[in-house]
From Swiss-Prot:
Biological or metabolic pathway of the protein: Protein modification; protein glycosylation
Protein name: Beta-1,4-galactosyltransferase 1
Residues that bind N-acetyl-D-glucosamine: G316, E317, D318, D319, R359
Residues that coordinate or bind Mn(2+): D254, H347
Cofactor(s) of this protein: Mn(2+)
PTM field: The soluble form derives from the membrane forms by proteolytic processing.
Sorted UniProt keywords: Cell membrane, Cell projection, Disulfide bond, Glycoprotein, Glycosyltransferase, Golgi apparatus, Lipid metabolism, Manganese, Membrane, Metal-binding, Secreted, Signal-anchor, Transferase, Transmembrane, Transmembrane helix
Length: 402
């Protein structure tokens, strides 16, 4: 029996011998690669020493060959995009270290500087997102809502249902930047049950309206006659200590809107929000009515010297406010009667909030008193500031009627 001849001419060696030689060559290449890697590791960033470590002598400084011919210092190997290390000096002073990546974020600049090993500008931090402005009309609105006051309200549950509301009743939209920085001011005394309903209904509404808002409950201390307008002035000044609000909504604690298209924000003219209350048969009681819930921008509020401080007891202050706006050439804007519907929590009149017998006389003299009675004559003392999960409560002493 004959063996077959080899497929290739020349050597009669078995095919395994060629494979063995290839393996030896591969091992040699790997060893060379490992050696070069070790040299780089020992040399660190000082690449000037690399030729000496591998046994290569650099050309003379005057030579026109090698590195000098392409404009690099002699004896230096330079990687693309890497700046050269500083020259070695015969000095006992320590060399200054090259800036690290941490330095680049601590002292941001236009791009990589000398000595940097970055080939491009550092990547910005991903913790800050570039958000666009919220739309003029929120896409989250649902329209008409059923408002009921015959269910018990647990504020712990309300807190759980509004996890994005921060301590003190602050909320900022997460997916856009709201131009409406709204402080909602509630004049208050002994209305805790009403406040529960207000917080239960209004927090979801205000979030759907994509407002950057805070809730401030201004609590009148003591047992003297209630003064709604003065408490609103206090709320204006105290809220501005927290944040740069540009809009102020002044709301009674017992009024709830029935349509979330009735936005709690400011417009080019002062805004009357509670235009169709169930108390008045869902209609406006009279054209000059400005009570319940209203909104004024910071500039509008300052231009009328705020609200009057001398209306102790019930009634009159909202008509005085309307007169102030008219005397400053402003007109009141309102939503239509369908969107502007509101429900009021029924209750008996509070003690120390009886009708003010002087209200009609004071309303008749608004033009003479508005320059001296308002923000520029406001006096009060803050007794306590309490930051609750759903609102900020500021208890104040506003004095007694003079």
């Amino acid at each position: 029996m004959k063996f077959r001849e080899p497929l290739l001419g020349g050597s009669a060696a078995m095919p395994g011998a060629s494979l063995q030689r290839a393996c030896r060559l591969l091992v040699a290449v790997c060893a060379l690669h490992l050696g070069v890697t070790l040299v780089y590791y020992l040399a660190g960033r000082d690449l000037r020493r690399l030729p000496q470590l591998v046994g290569v002598h650099p050309p003379l400084q005057g030579s026109s060959h090698g590195a000098a011919a392409i404009g690099q210092p002699s004896g230096e190997l330079r990687l693309r995009g890497v700046a050269p290390p500083p020259p070695l000096q015969n000095s006992s002073k320590p060399r200054s270290r090259a800036p690290s990546n941490l330095d680049a974020y601590s002292h941001p600049g236009p791009g990589p500087g000398p000595g940097s090993n970055l080939t491009s500008a550092p990547v910005p931090s991903t913790t800050t997102r570039s958000l666009t402005a919220c739309p003029e009309e929120s896409p989250l609105l649902v329209g008409p809502m059923l408002i009921e006051f015959n269910i018990p309200v647990d504020l712990k549950l309300v807190e759980q249902q509004n996890p994005k509301v921060k301590l003190g009743g602050r909320y900022t939209p997460m997916d856009c930047i709201s131009p409406h920085k709204v402080a909602i001011i509630i004049p208050f005394r002994n209305r805790q049950e009403h406040l529960k309903y207000w917080l239960y209904y209004l927090h979801p509404i205000l979030q759907r309206q994509q407002l950057d808002y805070g809730i401030y409950v201004i609590n009148q201390a003591g047992e003297s006659m209630f003064n709604r307008a003065k408490l609103l002035n206090v709320g204006f000044k105290e809220a501005l200590k927290d944040y740069d609000y540009n809009c102020f909504v002044f709301s009674d604690v017992d009024l709830i809107p029935m349509n979330d298209h009735n936005t709690y924000r400011c417009f080019s003219q002062p805004r009357h929000i509670s235009v169709a209350m169930d108390k008045f048969g869902f209609s406006l009681p009279y054209v000059q009515y400005f009570g319940g819930v209203s909104a004024l921008s910071k500039q509008q509020f300052l231009s009328i010297n705020g609200f009057p401080n001398n209306y102790w007891g019930w009634g009159g202050e909202d008509d005085d406010i309307y007169n102030r706006l008219a005397f400053r050439g402003m007109s009141v804007s309102r939503p239509n009667a369908v969107i502007g519907k509101c429900r009021m929590i029924r209750h008996s009149r509070d003690k120390k909030n009886e009708p003010n017998p002087q209200r009609f006389d004071r309303i008749a003299h608004t033009k003479e008193t508005m320059l001296s009675d308002g923000l520029n004559s406001l006096t009060y003392m803050v007794l306590e500031v309490q930051r609750y999960p759903l609102y900020t409560k500021i208890t104040v002493d506003i004095g007694t009627p003079s």
